[in-house]
Curated annotation (Swiss-Prot):
Homodimer. The gene is menD. This is 2-succinyl-5-enolpyruvyl-6-hydroxy-3-cyclohexene-1-carboxylate synthase. Keywords: Magnesium, Manganese, Menaquinone biosynthesis, Metal-binding, Thiamine pyrophosphate, Transferase. Belongs to the TPP enzyme family. MenD subfamily. It comes from Shigella dysenteriae serotype 1 (strain Sd197). GO terms for biological process: menaquinone biosynthetic process.
Length: 556
């Protein structure tokens, strides 16, 4: 009997089972112990293969692919610390709802905890973060193939969001020619191999039903809080709120067009919060709110009812309001709860939003970080998409810009780490095939610098703007101790990115003004390659501009 041949047949069943649940993208890191999985993936024509030498970046690449495709994405890694490097992407997926299937190769049990190289305790290493964890046995013909395929089917058939960890131990030898070992074991699945359906089909999830008293609540004074949504959901939500006559407070990821722009500014005005206190119901569509003032208002508001609608399960309200947690696809929920045409009940807030935007426009000429955040809507590629980094840049765009309704915007706003942002952006571009504008800070770019290797392979123009404010200037907005701020919080690195771009043979530009930036962008959108644009700005200007605008708008 050939161990290597049966390893491959066992792996082939696993990989084929994944295809029955919509897995098309598969991300593979180099490794020996994962050879059965890698070869099975390579031989299965249903997969689009992606490779990367860094497992942490590979996990985030898969995350980006899943964000756009809305389908589960598989990742194959070898044993040892390679597995641990998938943790950040798994955590993010669990919070933002992407589906990741982590196939981690392992040593067989007799080689664990006895000094064998590259052997660690992998089962359960991700604790409670995966939605499902499966520790498979060593491949053996004593276990029927129908057990293996139904085990995979159960985990994926009940997966609505987050990750599945499938730990796969393989004994040596890992290499060798294929023979008939295990062929009859594999063939006992019969015509399943010619079918395209799961062996075991799970019943669909039951979503929240129509709220029978909606006809009553839609006639009341309401507020719509729009969190992270798809482009389709964002457009529908904006029209729904407009019809109801309810003010919509839109997050940067809401894709609603933010009809009341600069919410993070005008929510700091007492007139706005006073008017919002009249709301009898708040309906929050989507989660992951970015703006600090929006988070503060959400925590302090006291409507009679607070409803949260999202297809992600779990508690999504840090303020623990009395109300309803409705698990549903947002677009479907809006169809079930039609708006009734009413006149807008808020008078002060639209005026404040307009004045706040005018205050931002008055400062748009300086070549700076805050001004880029405001101007970003002018630089978006046609029929494209935007990927926004974390820390200061996403807060500035949220507060100072007004993105078009229905324009796709992506970010990692679950755990909101700065790790893996370039890798995630690469996945977003690959899955969509669209022109992509990605904006990150200098520390974020440094953190994921080797992901520039992924950006060498793009199917449409990709522009990466690195806003270099020389450190983590988000801490300038926080009451960090002034004497320790630079050394222990900002951590300026005093570096530039020209040589990093050259190392990976990417185009690089460092514009000095808006005209130069716009010229570079116009050229970049013409060719399906990656262009790195480093925008060097004064260290604290972005944070200071935001603070000045907050003070100005609070006194309107």
């Amino acid at each position: 009997m050939s161990v290597s041949a049966f390893n491959r047949r066992w792996a082939a069943v696993i990989l084929e089972a994944l295809t029955r649940h919509g897995v098309r993208h598969i991300c593979i890191a180099p490794g020996s112990r994962s050879t059965p999985l890698t070869l099975a993936a390579a031989e299965n024509s249903a997969f689009i293969h992606h490779t990367h030498f860094d497992e942490r970046g590979l996990g985030h690449l898969a995350l980006g692919l899943a964000k756009v495709s809305k389908q589960p994405v598989a990742v194959i890694v070898t044993s040892g610390t390679a597995v641990a490097n998938l943790y950040p992407a798994l955590i993010e997926a669990g919070l933002t709802g992407e589906k990741l299937i982590l196939l981690t190769a392992d040593r067989p049990p007799e080689l664990i905890d006895c000094g064998v190289n590259q052997a660690i305790r992998q089962p359960g290493m991700f604790a409670s973060h995966p939605t499902h964890s499966i520790s498979l046995p060593r491949p053996t013909q004593d276990i029927p193939a129908r057990w293996l395929v139904s085990t995979i089917d159960h985990a994926l058939g009940t997966l609505h969001a987050g990750g599945v960890h499938i730990n796969c131990p393989f004994a040596e030898p890992l290499y060798g020619e294929m023979d008939d070992t295990g062929l009859s074991w594999q063939q006992r699945l019969g015509d399943w191999w010619q079918d395209d359906k799961p062996w075991l089909r799970e019943a669909p999830r039951l979503e929240s039903e129509k709220q029978r008293d909606w006809f009553f609540w839609r006639q009341k004074r309401g507020v719509v809080v729009a969190g992270r949504m798809s482009a389709e959901e964002g457009k529908k939500a904006a029209l729904w709120a407009q019809t109801l006559g309810w003010p919509l407070i839109g997050d940067v990821l809401s894709q609603t067009g933010q009809p009341l722009p600069c919410a993070d500014l005008w929510l700091g005005n007492a007139k706005a919060t006073s008017e919002l206190q009249q709301a009898q119901i708040v309906v929050q569509l989507g989660s992951s709110l970015t703006g600090k003032r929006l988070q503060q208002w959400q925590a302090s508001c006291e409507p009679v009812e607070y409803w949260i609608v999202d297809d992600i399960e779990g508690r999504l309200d840090p303020a623990h309001h009395r109300g309803r947690r409705l698990i549903a696809n947002i677009a479907d929920w809006l169809e079930l709860h039609p708006a009734e045409k009413c006149q807008p009940w808020c008078v002060e807030i639209p005026r404040l939003a307009e004045q706040a935007m005018q205050a931002v426009i008055a400062r748009r000429d300086a070549f700076g970080e805050a001004q880029l955040a405001h101007r970003v809507c002018d630089y978006l590629p046609e029929q494209g998409q935007l990927f926004v980094g974390n820390s200061l840049v996403v807060r500035l765009i949220d507060a100072l810009s007004q993105l078009p309704a229905g324009y796709p915007v992506y970010s990692n706003r679950g755990a909101s780490g700065i790790d893996g942002l370039l890798s995630t952006a690469a996945g977003v571009q690959r899955a969509s095939g669209k022109p992509t504008l990605a904006i990150v800070g200098d520390l974020s770019a440094l953190y994921d610098l080797n992901a520039l290797a992924l950006l060498r392979q793009v199917s449409a123009p990709l522009v990466l703007i690195v806003v270099n404010n020389n450190g983590g200037q988000i801490f300038s907005l926080l009451p960090t101790p002034k004497s320790e701020r630079e050394c222990f919080y900002l951590m300026p690195q005093n570096v530039h990115f020209e040589h990093a771009a050259a190392m990976f043979e990417l185009k690089y530009h460092r514009p000095q003004n808006w005209q130069e930036l716009e010229t570079v962008l116009a050229d970049a959108w013409r060719t399906p390659t990656t262009t790195v644009i480093e925008m060097v700005v004064n260290d604290t200007d972005g944070a200071q501009t935001l603070q000045q605008l907050l003070a100005q708008v609070s006194h309107l």
